[in-house]
């Protein structure tokens, strides 16, 4: 039996989650970037063999993409954007969640909300990374590796410029 429950988060609710994220960022300042990535990967590994609700599973794919984006040596995300992404991943360093993970059906609700909020904030970066990965995959066809660094660099620069334009536009609105 499937039960669908839908809810909206008010501005007040979002401020509450923003406050929690700020606390996590403050605590994560003591953590090296590698620790933040490692903690996020540990969460992903733990959940890989866990029966989580579909809404959580969908968000975990976004979380995996965030980690990949930050660690992808070919994408070479600039330092400012890496910092922004790591700030978003900071919530996953803390072992104590807003909602304890062991509660069936709901335990990962706070994680899913945080992932969604971080993904919303990182939309320009995630879009650029998604397009970069698609481009790289398409060019991996047999015989397409000649000049690989050049065509990856060219596409990367285009996408990072687009990302910056979108970020500026988003900040103005």
Placement of each model-derived feature along the sequence:
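Terminal, membrane-proximal amphipathic helices
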Residues: 1-83, 120-173
């Amino acid at each position: 039996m499937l039960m669908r429950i839908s809810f909206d988060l008010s501005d007040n609710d979002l401020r509450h989650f923003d406050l929690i994220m700020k606390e996590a960022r403050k605590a994560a300042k003591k953590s090296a970037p590698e620790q933040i990535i490692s903690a996020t990967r540990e969460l992903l590994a733990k959940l890989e063999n866990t029966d989580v609700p579909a809404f959580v599973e969908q968000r975990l794919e976004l979380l995996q993409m965030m980690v990949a984006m930050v660690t992808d040596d070919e994408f070479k995300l600039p330092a400012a954007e890496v910092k922004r992404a790591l700030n978003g991943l900071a919530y996953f360093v803390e072992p104590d969640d807003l909602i304890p993970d062991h509660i069936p059906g709901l335990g990962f609700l706070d994680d899913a909300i945080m992932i969604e909020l971080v993904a919303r904030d990182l939309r320009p970066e995630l879009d650029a990374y998604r397009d970069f990965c698609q481009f790289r995959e398409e060019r991996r066809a047999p015989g397409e590796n000649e000049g690989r660094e050049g065509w990856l660099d060219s596409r990367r620069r285009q996408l990072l410029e687009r990302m910056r334009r979108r970020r500026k536009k988003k900040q103005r609105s």
